[in-house]
């Protein structure tokens, strides 16, 4: 389940770099290609967690549009990043921010668990 718009390249690049200096992509979804990607470094996650991540990412991009990535910062904090093509007039910046805050509230326990998993990994 790869998509061609650069997320795979970004993911491969992040896994090659020193994780103490750069973010590591956990997963992402792209509304333009209608694809989802999970970093293979995290294939040991339980299937239920992987499925929840997929649903969350795809749901966001279907609702808001653009590209959503979940990334670990060097300190282990999990962040959500959203971007859109410059010519995507349907993408809603304000709606994206509101939806991200909603997801952060609703998925707080999942995010905390993933941060802990990443730190001990």
Predicted regions: what they are:
Residues 1-19:
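Short, positively charged and aromatic/hydrophobic N-terminal segments
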Residues 12, 41-43, 82-88:
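Secondary-structure transition/turn motif
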Residues 4, 38, 42-49, 96, ...:
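Intrinsic-disorder-associated interaction segments
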Residues 62-118:
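Amphipathic protein-protein interaction modules
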Residues 13, 55-58, 89, 96:
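Intrinsically disordered, low-complexity segments enriched in polar/charged residues with Gly/Pro
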Residues 1, 15, 52-61, 115-121:
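Hydrophobic, Leu/Ile/Phe/Ala-enriched alpha-helical segments that form helix-helix packing faces
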Residues 17-63:
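Negatively charged, low-complexity tracts enriched in Asp/Glu with abundant Ser/Thr
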